[in-house]
Structures are given as C-alpha cells and as structure tokens.
Amino acid sequence: MVRSGKNGDLHLKQIAYYKRTGEYHSTTLPSERSGIRRAAKKFVFKEKKLFYVGKDRKQNRLVIVSEEEKKKVLRECHENDSGAHHGISRTLTLVESNYYWTSVTNDVKQWVYACQHCQVAKNTVIVAPKQHLLKVENPWSLVTVDLMGPFHTSNRSHVYAIIMTDLFTKWIVILPLCDVSASEVSKAIINIFFLYGPPQKIIMDQRDEFIQQINIELYRLFGIKQIVISHTSGTVNPTESTPNTIKAFLSKHCADHPNNWDDHLSAVSFAFNVTHLEPTKNTPYFQMFSRNPYMPETSDSLHEVDGDNTSMFAKILDAIKEADKIMENKTTSLGQMENNNLDELNKSKIIVKKKPKQLNPFHLKVGHEVLRQRKNWWKDGRFQSEWVGPCVIDYITESGCAVLRDNTGVRLKRPIKMSHLKPYIRESSEQESLYLLQGSVVADHDYIGLPEIPIGAYQANILVEDATIGIVDNELLTSSKDRELLEYRNTKISPLIDDHSSLEKQTFSLLDSSNQVLEYLS
C-alpha cells in the first residue's frame, strides 16, 4: 500500500533500492520502513530488473518507473497489429499481464480518453444504406424462381424442375431440368422470356455466387444485366414465392409418374392457373389476361376419351381441384382448432377476483380505544405481529389515517393506517372503572362489552333494538331463564343509569375523586 499523498514512482524506487542493497533509501521516512519491508516481499530482482510477483509469487510483471516507458507500454497495448484500438478493459488486461506500476488503472483510462482516434470512432455513426423496396404493381414485373428436385429420372433424362411464379398474379410456369447448373437454369429462364418477356427483377433463394453465374449467362444469352437478385437482399417484402399447394402436388405427381412426369408439367401449371383462387376471388389466368379461358361447358369431352378412358389433363385438373379443397379444408380446420383452443383456454382460466382491501375493517371512529401494529416478522410459516397500546383515536385524516393519543394524552407524531389498528378489549375490572370515570363517553365504544355478563343477556337486548337501555318489554321474555338474565342485567346497569345525570355534572380528576368512588362502590 502507498500512503496517501506519496508518489507511486518514488515508492517503487524505494522498494528497488531496498531489494538491491538491503538498506533503506534516503527518502524513506522511519514510519514507512515497515511498509517497505512488507511490500518488498512481492518483488524480486532478475537480470538487474525489478519484477512484481505478488503474494502467490506466480506473476512475473516488469516494474515500469519512467514516464517514457509507461507511454511506450500504453501505446503498444492500446493498438494492435491491424491498427484497431482496444477499449479500457482490454488495454488494462494487456498491460497488467506483463507490466506493473502503482497508477496503472488511472493511466490506462486517461490514455484511452485522450486517444484522438478512439474519440473520432466513438462519435462516428455508420448509417446503413436505405433499401428501396420493389413494389409489385403490374403483372409479370417481379417474379420468383424456385428449383425442385431431384425427382426420379424421366425418360428424357430430366431430374429437376424450375418453377417461375409472378408475385402479382400468382401465374406459374413449370419447366423440366436435366441438372441445376447455372447454364441449364439460364436456358430455362430464357425460354420463359421468349413466351412472356423478361420481368423487371427475378428473385432466387440461392447463394450469391450461383446468382452471379446466372446473371453472367443471361447477359451472354439475352443481353440483360443483373436481373436476378437474392431473396435475402431485402428489396422485397418476405412473401411466399410459390404456393404450398403446387409444391405438394408436384412432389406427389412426380412420385406417381416416375417415368413421364416431365411431360405433364405444362398441364399441371395450366390447371393450377385456371383453378386456384386468389384472395381477390380471381384465378391467376384472369389476373394475367383479364379474362377467363375458354373451357368446355360439360366435362364429357375431357372425361370421355376412347370410351371409358379419362384424359390426362382431366385427371390433373381434378387432382388439383381436390388438392385445393383439401388445403382449404385444412386451413379452415386449423383456424377452427385455434379458435376452439383459444375458447377452451379462456374458459379454463380461473379469474381470481381480488378481495377489496378493507381500509377500516373494524369501523373505528374518533374516541375509540385501539391497539396499533408496530412490526411484522416471519415465524412458524406466517407473519407475526406485535400490538402496542392502548391509544385513543384523536381524529381521522382525509387519506383515511388515524391520529392517535397515548394513555398520557400525548399525540403520536405519525398518522397510522386504519388497517394497522384493531379494537382494544378491556378486562372486566378495567371496564367497571372505565364506566365510572368516563360517564357517557363509554357510549361511543360500541365494540366494548361486559365480559362478566352471560351471552343470553346480550341476546335479550338485541331483540329490542329501539328500546331504552335497561327497559325491555316483559312480553318478549317468556321463560324464567330470560327473566333471571334480565334481572341480572338490570342490577349491573341500572345504578349507572340512575347516577348518569349526576356524574355528567361532576368534573373531577382521578386523585380528587378516589374517595367518592370508594364510597359509591361500598
């Protein structure tokens, strides 16, 4: 440790002098000698150089003292061989792995903060170039190309198929391929150009090297540059290029006709274009040509060829219609299942209604005696509470908190929440003295009862809610037991009622009235 205000370089020089000579440097104070001896245990001399080895003596860090050597070390550790600059954490790690001085952390921070290259790079924001999304507004302006296969080798040596789909009309064109080389794919695309003309852009989900080879072939064969772009270039919205229906049907059809599947690709694409309904409720054929194709009114000409034999196109057409129905039913059933699952999930949810918080569960009022909750602690698997008091409610604030007074009449400093209060129930001896000393004030304590009076006496009093205290209709008390309870009750309460008026007029303290209380009780 270096004492506060001492130069760190001087501290290292004193340690080096002590390790080299075994004596203290002339600048070492007597109070610093014990610290120098303890610190010297973490250093060793090797080849006339001082190294820091630490307490475990496993480190081997060269001690740097001069300012020029520090700057050289910081420059080497901050900049790497490629010219990039490290941050504070990486630079500090590189410095501390081989070098040591007392202020290494602060020096690294100041060096990085003062680096002009780092400050310029920190404030430079690299803005990505804006990508202009291609809008699909016209037929055959933006198309996608998908490659499918390998299938069973046909009689004409075809193994793959290329599917070109117009994103605006969903018009598809399918051609067979012998392989998926750039030259073979480019020739198939050129043949489609000769039928419908070249689009503005062609989107392919292939690697960039393959797309570049196709662009070179298209420029050589057709003279058009950079017409094919990658699907991941972000120039179009991520939409499904080829419908799943045609992909699934084509895979099944090629498996069912392994030898001549390539002869039926034109029929498959035409059947799909005249039957598949888009969200606009129009077929791709109508979207492409603004008219419907001429189709025979009856299917006899299609289904009756050479007697009972059915034409291949009719089979393909019926199969595609059936595939569309299956896909539509599957989509509908999936939607219904999702809705049913959501309904079941909503029904299974247990709606837990939170019990409203009772701000004043005991209906406490001004003048009531209460106990206040001082603290809670966890014990035996539940919260335990400590209640102190009694206190009297002085008044209730607008926020629903109670201001209390203690037994001596001193008001408490902080208001207490009503939920942290509960009624104070006095013992029998305390209640009798309370009745005698407080007079009519006891009438406000509607929750304070007489524990020494049996429960039946309260039941008799509840039957007549509007009657005066101590007066009960005798007709309601039919049994002898009730009469006994009434008499017992009257003997307890009637003396208080008789002297009620006189007690109200008298104002005396507890000390002055002690003799009168003893005389009254006797």
UniProtKB/Swiss-Prot annotation:
GO terms for molecular function: nucleic acid binding. Widely expressed. Also found in tumors originating from parathyroid gland, colon, stomach, bladder, uterus and prostate. The keyword Phosphoprotein applies. The modification Phosphoserine is found at S502. This is Gypsy retrotransposon integrase-like protein 1. Residues 135-292 form the Integrase catalytic domain. Keywords: Phosphoprotein. InterPro entries: Integrase_cat-core, Integrase_H2C2, Retrovirus_Pol_polyprotein, RNaseH-like_sf, RNaseH_sf. One of its GO terms (biological process) is DNA integration. The keyword 4Fe-4S does not apply. The lineage of its organism: Eukaryota, Metazoa, Chordata, Craniata, Vertebrata.
